[in-house]
Regions:
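Small beta-barrel nucleic-acid-binding modules, primarily SNase/OB-fold domains
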Residues: 1-145
Length: 145
């Protein structure tokens, strides 16, 4: 039997840090919120802060894509597998869903994380060695246009 995920509502996206990380005010209920850094799980995007100019350009592009995706959204949900789903840098690790008024619909919708993969903005990442094949990303993005 699958375990139910933990669902958190985002009151406000404070900042898109890079293509796979945001700062957000998370609604804990009872008019209580907490500002946390959230790392999108299962993805690795090109870095926007690097000396590699090709990677930097791609990193800035995916950061802009994520900003547009989250801009003016009032219904953003973070779905995690554990109640304290944090990674080694203390960031919450989860999937983002936008436009979800009903919490239960997250199980039926495609996450922002998966959209990034499908549109060629990132690599699948589940720990371990990171793969940085920029040609693969560019080819996938061209095929989705």
């Amino acid at each position: 039997m699958d375990k139910d995920p933990y669902i958190y509502r985002v009151k406000k996206v404070i900042k898109v840090v890079d293509g796979d990380t945001i700062d957000a005010d998370i609604d804990l209920g009872f008019d209580i919120s907490l500002t946390k850094r959230v790392r999108l799980s299962g993805v690795d995007t090109p870095e926007s802060r690097t000396t590699d100019l090709k990677e930097k350009a791609l990193g800035l592009e995916v950061k802009e894509w994520l900003k547009k995706k989250l801009q003016d959204q009032t219904d953003i949900i973070i779905k995690t597998e554990l109640p304290d789903s944090t990674e080694k840098y203390g960031r919450i690790l989860g999937q983002l869903f936008v436009g979800d008024k009903e919490v239960m619909s997250v199980n039926k919708k495609k996450s922002v994380n998966q959209q990034m993969i499908d549109e060629g903005y990132c690599w699948v990442y589940n720990g371990g060695t990171k793969k940085k094949d920029f040609a693969e990303l560019e080819a996938k993005r061209k095929s989705t246009l």
